[in-house]
């Protein structure tokens, strides 16, 4: 059975991700106490189910301490993948304010003696970060701070389409003006390269469009940058693989995240596709098609 565990910070989009998995045919359970996960997996496997998705939050803090060992045990019999959703505190506060929802650890809703009474929203968010921090290393992290719901659904679809084993290498383009992705393991700044933005014909395009590709591909300095990043990753990827890392996110940043970073992320992904299971995502470029422009909430 393939088991997808969705965890992370409340308000970061776990419900959106779970709905996407339900649409993909997964048996979905929201806010399951972690201690019941092994029994649920066994029951569904006996019942013929081959895909399970479970969303877990920080309300059962005692059980969260047992999750790393539980994940290792489940992985012996099942294909277990962990999706860890994160977002900046500022984004989360704005989302809770807009939806008028109460954070699960704030005020009177927190009954866990280990958690205590958390009056401010910011305090509840930071406490939750501490409680779930141990799960982040087991999963593929996605920063949803500036992400729209339809884009998150598309990224979840790509996540579950990956091969069953091996290192997943994520190339993520972004714009520094919207902040560095929280999920990045490595960040490469390519703002020193010539910017197609200053060509009025190229400005509305992205690094996926042929005129922008031709512009950047003709510059030796661009290829020097790509070659250097590729050599660095080719050298160190085996070490991460030997360390049993399942996911590695390489963030490529330019000013707006539309031209240079997109082109370089795509080029690196093509070059390293034989070395790992590669995913590409473009956080800030308008290249993800979808029916909704609503931000993750």
Swiss-Prot record:
Originating species: Paraburkholderia xenovorans (strain LB400)
UniProt binding sites for ATP: 8-15
Disulfide bridges in this chain: none
Binding sites annotated in the UniProt record for GTP: 57-60
Assigned keywords, A-Z: ATP-binding, GTP-binding, Nucleotide-binding
Listed name of the protein: Nucleotide-binding protein Bxeno_A0336
InterPro entries: P-loop_NTPase, RapZ-like, RapZ-like_N, RapZ_C
Function according to Swiss-Prot or TrEMBL: Displays ATPase and GTPase activities.
Family: Belongs to the RapZ-like family.
Pfam family, one: PapZ_C
Keyword match Transmembrane: no
Superkingdom field: Bacteria
GO MF annotations in UniProt: ATP binding; GTP binding
């Amino acid at each position: 059975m393939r088991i997808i565990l969705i965890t992370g910070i409340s308000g970061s989009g776990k419900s959106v991700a779970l709905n996407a998995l339900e649409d993909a045919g997964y048996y979905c359970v929201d806010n399951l106490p972690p201690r019941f996960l092994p029994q649920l997996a066994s029951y569904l496997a006996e019942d013929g189910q081959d895909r399970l998705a479970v969303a877990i939050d920080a309300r059962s803090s005692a059980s969260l301490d047992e999750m790393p060992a539980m994940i290792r045990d489940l992985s012996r019999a099942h294909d277990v993948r962990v999706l860890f959703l994160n977002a900046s505190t500022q984004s989360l506060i704005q989302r809770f304010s807009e939806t008028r929802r109460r954070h699960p650890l704030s005020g009177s809703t927190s009954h866990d003696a280990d958690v205590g009474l958390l009056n401010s929203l910011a305090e509840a968010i930071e406490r939750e970060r501490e409680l779930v921090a141990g799960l982040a290393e087991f999963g593929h992290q996605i920063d949803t701070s500036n992400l729209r719901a339809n884009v998150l659904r598309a990224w979840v679809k790509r996540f579950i389409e990956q091969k069953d084993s091996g290192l997943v290498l994520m190339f993520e383009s972004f714009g520094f003006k919207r902040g560095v992705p929280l999920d990045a393991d490595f960040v490469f700044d390519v703002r020193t390269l010539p910017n197609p933005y200053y060509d009025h014909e190229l400005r509305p395009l992205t690094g996926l469009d042929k005129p922008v590709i031709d512009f950047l591909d003709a510059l030796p300095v661009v290829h020097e940058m790509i070659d250097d990043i590729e050599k660095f990753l080719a050298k160190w990827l085996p070490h991460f693989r030997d360390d049993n890392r399942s996911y590695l996110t390489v963030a490529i940043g330019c000013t707006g995240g539309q031209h240079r970073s997109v082109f370089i992320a795509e080029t690196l992904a093509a070059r390293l596709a034989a070395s790992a299971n590669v995913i590409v995502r473009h956080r800030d470029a308008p290249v993800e098609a979808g029916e909704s422009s609503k931000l993750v909430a």
